[in-house]
Regions:
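Conserved alpha/beta-domain cores
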Residues: 1-189
Length: 189
């Protein structure tokens, strides 16, 4: 998987280096397996050109921590501005949807890694955005299993569709809190 990709040319250059390495190993008499090529979507330029990048890759992984940081120009480790690190920012949610759709159109798998998938409500929202593969710390796996088992993807798709029409983090938080109060948003049954 190629990290911090920002352009199609970078992917092509990296794939050429990979091919050269495979040819060198084959020339030495070694058997080289087919290696799927993945792209980390971590910067806005990669997210915005996802439809082009999808033609060059076998899969995407969206690195939400970096994508949020670089899209919002906020250093999540700097206490002076880290409060502006907003996973629910409309731009972030729209980028996630855009990348998922681009991958789907090209028929490639897209997964999500980062802290978003480790938060129960955000995980439900990611499911509502059509994302189905997640990477997280081992400690978050039991929670994620429970959330996935209890979540109605259909209901969360409705919630996500509404969330994607809202213009501010505050409006999104308000809507989600109302949904939670109504019926534990996204739960089966």
């Amino acid at each position: 998987m190629f990290p911090f990709v920002s352009s199609v040319q970078e992917v092509r250059d990296a794939k050429n280096l990979l091919l050269e390495a495979q040819e060198e190993l084959t020339a030495r008499g070694l058997r080289v397996p087919d290696v799927p090529v993945g792209i980390m979507i971590e910067v806005p330029s990669a997210a915005f050109t996802a439809s082009l990048l999808a033609k060059e890759a076998d899969f995407f992984t969206i690195g939400t921590n970096d994508l949020i940081q670089y899209t919002l120009a906020v250093d999540r480790t700097d206490d002076r501005v880290s409060n502006r690190y907003e996973p629910l920012h409309p731009a972030i949610l729209r980028l996630l949807r855009h990348v998922r759709r681009a991958a789907a159109r090209q028929g490639i798998v897209v997964s999500v890694c980062g802290e978003m998938a480790s938060d129960p409500l955000l995980l439900k929202l990611l499911i509502g955005c059509g994302l189905r593969e997640f990477s997280m710390t081992p400690g978050a796996i039991p929670m994620a299993r429970r959330v996935v088992k209890e979540t109605s993807a259909r209901q969360m798709m409705r919630v996500a569709a509404r969330v994607l029409t809202l213009g501010t983090v505050e409006e999104i938080e308000q809507y989600l809190s109302e949904e939670v109060a109504k019926n534990e948003v996204g739960s089966e049954g």
